[in-house]
């Protein structure tokens, strides 16, 4: 670990303890080494006992900076993991940071272009149009055609900052997983890895540009969604250039009403857009919060959406799409047995799951929803409650399903904000039924046969040999399985022992360094460091050797 990373680790620990996050872990699950680690930071006490857990976590994220703020925002969408009170607190986090100097922005833009800004642009505005934790936006005019454009450039050194904070998050998540147990529903390591995938995608602006081009092509001349044109020849990993658009923020209800926007059409169009992206195109915008959605100023009686920021996109497998559509249809038919079957058939929960118990759990959660009219039932809430129930039966929610759930909740909230009488079920049901008939009915079967026929015609002569090879492999697999399991269990025991020693040694070295910097007695600082080094050597030597299973 570098001195910088040690300082950052201490800052994270200090902030977490200052807000008493350690007190939120139940005492009964805290092992001895957790209590030992807490004692080594005896001078750091909870200064916010009057605040509830969700507010404490929000303030910690806020104090630790942009990477943690975005992590908190992502956590706020994981309502399958967090209680609503915690999620609502984290949703208040704002991704707003002061802009960096425009001279640095110019240098970074010119570095990507390989030439002066004046070669391609006129009227470059040194005052940023917007500034966020990952990037900053400036406006200009293209020399070639005189059109207004937006330049989005990454913040300086943001990749290194993100990488350093992600490394610390991963270590903290692995430690928490050890403390809480791998069966805990929070699954911290899984959540951090999902966040890593998301934020690393946002750091590649070229990928964002490619996503925007694809989404734009999917809805060309649709009259429902417009994506700004990307000047691909001027798009790079750290810089993208796009058409500048004029629209009304979707959250500005006063402006929408003032221009006479047909809010009913706009709300229904939003729901249709979501299901079209998911089921027709299998490519959906997964960051559709109000800051990324605008409404056209023209044709208010037949309005369309304008979508920005395509850094986070979602896709589903064909199987997941079918199971998802069937889930919604089964729910509205109150067929809870079919819902339980679908979760097992899809592989979302284990085939060993007690289907009767799962069906009963689904019924307990879903049946009370029908005490309200159908037009008040939320698709997103249905999906969320089903995921929460399935987690009790050891479902691991795939990242793409999390993105889908988050986007659906956004779209529903937006639709009901625009038009409170919006009937989501009546808007979506025809689309789902049509899609299901095309996929599962005779038309869908004929389409699949046509698509797969060349492959099976090519493989048919090899079928007897493939059957024989698979039977042979099956016998060998059963024989080797027990040997592999024994080796794996021994490796795990060694790994746990090594981790305890390494964690304790790291804390002692950090404490020794802090004591030394605070002019404490030499025996205390050097003693702490020496014991830490000895434990580190023991932990290093006891590490399991990497083996191939």
Swiss-Prot record:
Major enzyme class: transferase
Gene Ontology BP terms: regulation of ubiquinone biosynthetic process; ubiquinone biosynthetic process
Record-level GO cellular component terms: plasma membrane
Pathway: Cofactor biosynthesis; ubiquinone biosynthesis [regulation]
Keyword hit for Transport: no
Membrane topology: Multi-pass membrane protein
Superkingdom of origin organism: Bacteria
Residue positions of the active site: 287
TM region(s), chain numbering: 498-518, 520-540
Compartments it resides in: Cell inner membrane
Protein family (similarity comment): Belongs to the ABC1 family. UbiB subfamily.
HAMAP family attached to this UniProt entry: UbiB
PANTHER family xrefs: CHAPERONE-ACTIVITY OF BC1 COMPLEX CABC1 -RELATED, PROTEIN ACTIVITY OF BC1 COMPLEX KINASE 7, CHLOROPLASTIC
NCBIfam families in alphabetical order: PRK04750.1, UbiB
Entry protein name: Probable protein kinase UbiB
Organism: Shewanella woodyi (strain ATCC 51908 / MS32)
Gene (UniProt): ubiB
């Amino acid at each position: 670990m570098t001195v910088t990373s040690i300082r950052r680790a201490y800052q994270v620990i200090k902030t977490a303890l200052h807000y008493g996050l350690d007190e939120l872990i139940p005492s009964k699950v805290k092992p001895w080494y957790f209590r030992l680690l807490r004692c080594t930071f005896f001078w750091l006490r909870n200064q916010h006992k009057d605040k509830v857990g969700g507010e404490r976590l929000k303030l910690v994220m806020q104090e630790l900076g942009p990477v943690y703020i975005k992590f908190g925002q992502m956590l706020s969408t994981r309502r399958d993991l967090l209680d609503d009170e915690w999620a609502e607190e984290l949703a208040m986090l704002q991704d707003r940071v002061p802009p960096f100097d425009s001279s640095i922005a110019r240098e970074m833009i010119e570095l990507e272009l390989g030439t002066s800004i004046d070669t391609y642009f006129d009227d470059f505005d040194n005052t940023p149009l917007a500034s966020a934790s990952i990037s900053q936006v400036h406006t200009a005019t293209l020399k070639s055609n005189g059109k207004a454009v937006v330049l989005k450039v990454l913040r300086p050194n943001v990749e290194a900052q993100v990488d350093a904070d992600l490394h610390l998050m991963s270590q903290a998540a692995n430690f928490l997983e050890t403390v809480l147990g791998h069966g805990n529903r929070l699954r911290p390591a899984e959540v951090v890895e999902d966040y890593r995938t998301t934020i690393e995608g946002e750091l590649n602006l070229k990928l964002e540009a490619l996503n925007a081009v694809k989404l734009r092509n999917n809805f060309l001349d649709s009259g429902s969604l417009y994506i700004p044109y990307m000047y691909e020849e001027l798009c790079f990993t750290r810089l993208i250039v796009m058409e500048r658009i004029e629209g009304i923020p979707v959250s500005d209800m006063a402006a929408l009403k003032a221009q006479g926007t047909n809010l009913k059409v706009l709300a229904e169009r939003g729901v249709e857009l979501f299901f079209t992206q998911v089921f027709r195109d299998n490519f959906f915008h997964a960051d559709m919060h109000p800051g990324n959605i605008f409404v056209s100023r023209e044709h208010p009686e037949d309005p369309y959406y304008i979508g920005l920021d395509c850094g986070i996109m979602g896709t589903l497998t064909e199987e997941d799409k079918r199971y998802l559509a069937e889930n919604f249809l089964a729910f509205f038919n109150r067929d809870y047995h079919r819902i339980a079957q679908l979760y097992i058939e899809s592989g979302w929960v284990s085939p060993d799951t007690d289907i009767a118990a799962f069906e009963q759990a689904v019924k307990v959660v879903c049946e009370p929803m029908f005490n309200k009219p159908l037009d008040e039932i939320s698709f997103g809430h249905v999906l969320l409650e089903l995921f929460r129930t399935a987690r009790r039966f050891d479902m691991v929610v795939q990242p793409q399903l999390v993105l889908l759930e988050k986007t659906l909740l956004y779209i529903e909230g937006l639709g009901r904000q625009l038009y409170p009488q919006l009937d989501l079920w009546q808007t979506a049901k025809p689309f789902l039924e049509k899609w299901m008939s095309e996929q599962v009915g005779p038309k869908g079967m004929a389409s699949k046969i046509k698509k797969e026929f060349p492959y099976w015609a090519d493989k048919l002569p090899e079928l007897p040999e493939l059957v024989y090879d698979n039977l042979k492999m099956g016998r060998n697999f059963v024989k080797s399985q027990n040997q592999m399991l024994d080796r794996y269990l021994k490796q795990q025991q060694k790994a746990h022992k090594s981790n305890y020693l390494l964690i304790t040694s790291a804390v002692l070295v950090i404490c020794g360094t802090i004591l030394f910097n605070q002019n404490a007695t030499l025996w205390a600082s050097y003693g702490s460091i020496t014991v830490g080094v000895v434990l580190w050597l023991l932990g290093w030597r006891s590490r399991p050797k990497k083996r191939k299973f």
